[in-house]
Regions:
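Acidic-and-aromatic substrate-binding clefts and catalytic sites of carbohydrate-active enzymes
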Residues: 51-56, 83, 121-127, 150-157, ...
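Active-site gating/metal-coordination segments in enzymes
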Residues: 71-205, 211-212
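Catalytic metal-binding/acid-base residues of hydrolase active sites
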Residues: 10, 148, 178-179, 228, ...
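Active-site region of glycoside hydrolase catalytic domains
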Residues: 208-221
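Active-site gating loops and adjacent loop-to-helix segments of metal-dependent hydrolytic enzymes
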Residues: 13-53, 181-201, 238-261
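Short acidic/glycine-rich loop or secondary-structure boundary segments that cap or lie
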Residues: 183, 231-235, 240, 272-274
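Hydrophobic faces of well-ordered beta-strands that scaffold small-molecule active sites
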Residues: 5-7, 73-75, 114-117, 143-145, ...
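Mid-to-C-terminal alpha-helical segments outside catalytic/metal-binding sites
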Residues: 2-7, 12-72, 100-108, 129-133, ...
Length: 338
């Protein structure tokens, strides 16, 4: 049976400090327990998200993994904790709390979890310092970053040095949507989650390509959450724009050339969407991801991959587990600590 690696899962420390009491700002996420197995993530005094102990308890996660046939989870922070809006030193402390917790969780269960860190990208020098600590001291396998930093797209020159160092150190980057575009038009129907997230993810991918980041740093390893959002669908439109507006070009080749280097998780809920992703980028560039433990997650993880009849057994095996390890620079068969 194919090994199953759930690349897209989120975790938060049960005892995350109350940063409102330590630093200025009311936007710090605070975990308020509602019972022994439940809590609210509070932001600015309002409930941002209701969560269960699945989001902090490794033991509960392993129970669910065993029940759903998942061998390994890749742990990453919840995007609301990125705290890009805060003073860099305060945000660095928030990053350290989470990175240390994730690293400790991996050390407790090294055969079940792989860790990704977070860095305060509002200050690139501080973020590079924490990225180095994550990889070289904590043993984390990559860094999760948001799709924008305080409204700046990822091709903004402010982030050039970060991407340069990520490429130099061969650090995989998992790009996850947060603070989506058009929020003022999305308060109803939870449009932020169903429309905003796909649109925001597509904009991030397009920015990295059209802004020249991928041409400048061709060895960057980048994986987009949520199947890349609407990016796979709009890629031909991006190519057309590149061809008809030569005066706007910042790259020597059309977007589809650079897009082939991207990885994507499989979280698009539908076999036709998954087939488009594979047709456009190759099955080797798709990793299984469920968004555990949140409400919109795929249950069981890998369900759509299993149901996509056009895939061979070898292709499914790659998507369900092997591609994630390859992306994270973990040699298959040599153990997670290699």
């Amino acid at each position: 049976m194919a090994m199953r690696v759930d690349f897209h899962t989120h975790i938060i420390p049960e005892d995350i400090p109350n940063f409102i009491e330590r630093f200025d700002g009311e936007r710090w996420p605070v975990l308020e327990k509602t019972c022994s197995c439940g809590a609210n993530i509070m932001v600015a005094g309002k409930v941002f998200r209701e969560v269960t102990d699945q989001v902090w308890s490794p033991q509960k996660r392993i129970q669910d993994m065993d029940a759903e046939g998942v061998d390994i989870q890749v742990l990453s922070p919840i995007p609301v904790t990125f705290s890009y809006w805060a003073e860099p030193i305060a945000a660095e402390e928030m990053s350290k709390v989470q990175n240390d917790f994730i690293a400790d969780t991996v050390k407790q269960y090294p055969n079940r979890f792989i860790g990704l860190g977070t860095v305060p990208l509002q200050d690139v020098e501080v973020s590079i310092r924490e990225m180095q600590r994550c990889i070289q001291e904590l043993g984390l396998k990559g860094i999760e970053i948001g799709t924008n930093i305080n409204g700046k797209n990822l091709d903004d020159p402010a982030f050039t040095k970060f991407f340069e160092m990520a490429e130099r150190w061969e650090v995989p980057l998992f790009i996850h949507p947060w603070e989506t575009l058009g929020t003022e038009r999305m308060p109803r129907h939870n449009f932020m989650y169903t429309v905003g997230i796909p649109s925001e993810t597509a904009l991030a991918a397009a920015s990295l390509i059209l802004g020249g980041v991928m041409e400048r740093f061709p060895k960057l390893k980048i994986c987009f959450a949520h199947g890349g959002g609407s990016f796979p669908s709009i890629l031909p439109r991006l190519d057309q724009g590149w061809h008809v507006w030569p005066h706007l070009r910042q790259t020597t080749k059309p977007p589809s050339y650079y897009a082939k280097s991207f990885y994507f998780d499989s979280l698009n809920y539908d076999a036709l969407n998954l087939k488009l992703l594979i047709d456009r980028f190759g099955f080797e560039k798709v990793v299984m991801g469920s968004d555990y433990p949140f409400l919109l997650r795929e249950i069981p993880p890998g369900k759509v991959v299993d149901e996509t009849l056009e895939l061979t057994d070898e292709q499914k095996k790659a998507i369900l587990g092997e591609n994630a390890l390859t992306f994270l620079n973990i040699k298959i068969g040599e153990g997670l600590e290699s």
